From Swiss-Prot:
One of its GO terms (cellular component) is cytosol. Belongs to the RNA methyltransferase TrmD family. Its main location: cytoplasm. Its EC number is 2.1.1.228. One of its GO terms (molecular function) is tRNA (guanine(37)-N1)-methyltransferase activity. GO terms for biological process: tRNA N1-guanine methylation. It holds the Pfam family tRNA_m1G_MT. It catalyses: guanosine(37) in tRNA + S-adenosyl-L-methionine = N(1)-methylguanosine(37) in tRNA + S-adenosyl-L-homocysteine + H(+). It comes from the Bacteria. This is tRNA (guanine-N(1)-)-methyltransferase.
Length: 253
């Protein structure tokens, strides 16, 4: 998968391109990450990419022209990597608190793209005309404001990359994460058996795989009910999960 990140701070992205699971995916050529600086597409000596807003007001606004040129260049690079560059295969995504909320369903959908062009804003934002003409979707990572789109872009990339085939060392790790089945994750334990008087649940030491699976599922259920009742309300169990819920509810009566 090809990612082009349009940013005035390309150095930030070494955190995702050189370290951890995402860095290994880059090293193994499962993912390509290009950082494109819009300053490289300016025409003045100061490489200026922002100006005062029309109508007055605080701060600066990123100008449309250098960003449009950066997007065109990003699409040309995606094409060189063999990607189809229309919006269905290579969307231009603006990271914005006004966008649609990033969730696991969106991540699963995004992993099927051939490429993504991620537009990182700064200052007061980006000229609306650029967004109207060039951006296919706006994505938010939460109802809060950051100093720029770089961190949200890294969050999006990390979440998508780890869902790509063969990126995770153990595919089951991704399958058991929170939200993948519509539930939060279960608790996890490792050595020692006793930590400051707190014991590992006996069922995890039993070696009985069916009982362990049931315990973990029910922990997911209880944790989701307590911490994210909104998720629980929308959860639809599969046949096996429905059987377990019915069995547990019956034993509790």
């Amino acid at each position: 998968m090809y990612f082009a990140v349009i940013t005035i701070l390309p150095e930030m992205f070494t955190a995702i391109s050189e370290y951890g699971i995402t860095g290994r995916a880059v090293q193994n050529k499962q993912v390509v990450i290009d950082c494109i600086n819009p300053r490289d597409f300016t025409t003045d000596n100061y490489r200026r990419i922002d100006e005062r807003p029309f109508g007055g007001g605080p701060g600066m606004v990123m100008m449309a022209e250098p960003l449009a040129k950066a997007i065109a260049y990003a699409k040309s690079q995606a094409s060189l990597h063999g990607c189809i560059t229309d919006s269905e295969h290579c969307p231009v995504v603006y990271l914005s608190p006004q966008g649609d909320k990033l969730d696991e369903a969106a991540v699963v959908s995004m992993r099927h793209y051939e490429a993504m062009i991620l537009l990182c804003g700064r200052y007061e934002g980006i000229d609306e005309r650029l967004l109207a003409r060039y951006v296919d979707m706006e994505i938010s990572i939460g109802d809060f404001v950051l100093t720029g789109g770089e961190l949200p872009a890294m969050v999006l990339m990390d979440s998508v990359i780890r869902r790509l085939p063969d990126v995770m060392g153990d595919a089951k790790s991704a399958e058991q994460d929170s939200f993948v089945e519509g539930l939060l994750d279960c608790p996890h334990y490792t050595k020692p058996h006793d930590f400051e008087g707190l014991q590992v649940p006996e069922v995890l030491l039993s070696g009985h795989h069916a009982n362990i699976a049931t315990w973990r599922f029910m922990q997911q259920v209880e944790r989701t009910k307590q911490r994210r009742p909104d998720l629980w309300q929308s959860f639809t169990p599969n046949a096996e999960q429905a059987r377990l819920l019915k069995k547990v509810n019956k034993t509790m009566k």
